[in-house]
Design a protein with these regions (language model features):
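Short loop/turn motifs that connect adjacent beta-strands in outer-membrane beta-barrel proteins
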Residues: 28-38, 135-142, 189-194, 223-224
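Residues on the lipid-exposed face of transmembrane beta-strands in outer-membrane beta-barrel proteins
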Residues: 42-44, 82-88, 128-132, 146-148, ...
Length: 260
């Protein structure tokens, strides 16, 4: 029941699934150089995040949630995460898509009746941002970006009692958008095939929302593309109807980049 309550709290403020933003990488041992031809990349990735958060109303705490990566994984029904990027010269455009479907069913005896609660949370997050290369050299690339992040979340909880033959359903929907700006890039480690990808952004949007994300890690180039492992953090705060919601997601993300 404790995990169910934690998941119900997550339903109030977006939960789960996260947005990891893998860095653009090259098949060579140095940062990709600028060209006047269109270049594309597709990066599927996975993020094993833990979730901590709190919710308060008029400065009075209404509850907290703390889910380990194992908790999130055990409740995960379906997930899809990818980045698609296009680049021509110094100009670029990327799309980061995340979909998560979490569900949990618990039961508890209330008197002589057995009460079951089934919670399902679906969340889609999209980031679309044009970017411009500020610095480009054989070993270092720095891109500036300005774009938007959108999030759609639907939570449904169904209470049922087989003994009493009664069912009740509650659902909520949340849609929020934010303008984000930030930097991303990579350092190549000498003449080796290893590099350091990095990313940071911050933005504001609807319902007095604030969001930020940052990651730092290590990657390696191969003939077919790149593999990266990063430590990733995403933070959200928004204030609908005098209610303050804080959500922090942190964990390791692994990504594979394919270029064409």
């Amino acid at each position: 029941m404790k995990k169910c309550l934690s998941l119900l709290l997550c339903n109030l403020f977006l939960a789960a699934a996260a947005q990891a933003q893998p860095a653009t990488t090259s098949a060579t041992t140095q940062a990709p150089m600028l060209t006047d031809q269109w270049k594309f990349s597709v990066t599927p990735y996975a993020w094993g995040m833990g979730i901590t958060g709190s919710i308060s109303h008029n400065d009075k705490s209404l509850g907290e949630v703390k889910l380990t990566p194992g908790d999130v994984l055990s409740d995960l029904k379906l997930a899809a995460m990818f980045v698609a990027e296009a680049r021509n010269g110094r100009l670029g455009l990327y799309l980061d898509g995340v979909y998560g479907d979490l569900g949990q069913t618990t039961s508890k005896a209330v008197g002589r009746a057995d009460l079951q609660a089934s919670t399902n949370l679906r969340m889609t997050m999209l980031t679309l941002a044009p970017n411009y290369t500020l610095q480009d050299s054989p070993s270092f690339r720095l891109d500036g970006l300005i774009g938007a992040r959108f999030m759609w979340q639907n939570a449904t909880t169904t209470f049922s009692s087989p003994d009493l033959k009664q069912t009740a359903t509650e659902s909520s929907n949340l849609q929020i958008g934010a303008v984000v700006a930030g930097l991303k890039g990579r350092f190549d480690l000498g003449s080796s095939k290893y590099f350091v990808p990095f990313y940071v952004d911050a933005g504001v949007g609807q319902s007095s929302s604030f969001t930020s994300q940052a990651y730092l890690g290590i990657g390696r180039t191969f003939d077919w593309g790149d593999v990266s492992l990063v430590a990733k953090n995403v933070y959200y705060q928004f204030k609908p109807y005098n209610t303050t919601v804080d959500l922090n997601m942190f964990g390791a993300a692994i990504a594979a980049t394919f270029r064409f």
